[in-house]
């Protein structure tokens, strides 16, 4: 099943549950960290037992950065024998627009995080989707958020990608 209907926090969990229970593979376009965390917490074990693969974040929000970092990490290892320590993705131009579902998803996440400090903490945690958060290193303050700034290495002004914290 491939679904493109957001906000996933509102519409997605029943479909994830149905797929997990039926052993049916599932893919979506979500960038909603709270939805994905809920999906993992509630249905990972069910999906694993049934053989279903639940794959979130298969859209523009995540795929280009995921693939770019994967290729860069492989190259760092192949060329230098070292793991990739840091990556910066710069998008100079893009075409397309933002759907009403995306706007509604953003509104929903902002409202939920504003009302619930625990959810806000999840939304701000770059390891929120880690299967074992306690084993992850503390990297200190993340540079994925903040105001536009001039990047001397790139020689241009840059601003964080709205999905950068999620993709971290």
Regions found by a protein language model. Give the residues of each.
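Rossmann-like NAD(P)-binding element
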Residues: 1-10
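Structural motif
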Residues: 3-4, 29, 57
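ADP-ribose/adenylate-binding Rossmann-like module
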Residues: 7, 18-37
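Rossmann-fold NAD(P)-binding glycine/threonine-rich loop
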Residues: 12, 30-52
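Alpha-helical structural signal in soluble globular domains
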Residues: 18-22, 42, 46, 75
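Active-site-lining helix/loop region of Rossmann-like oxidoreductase modules
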Residues: 74-168
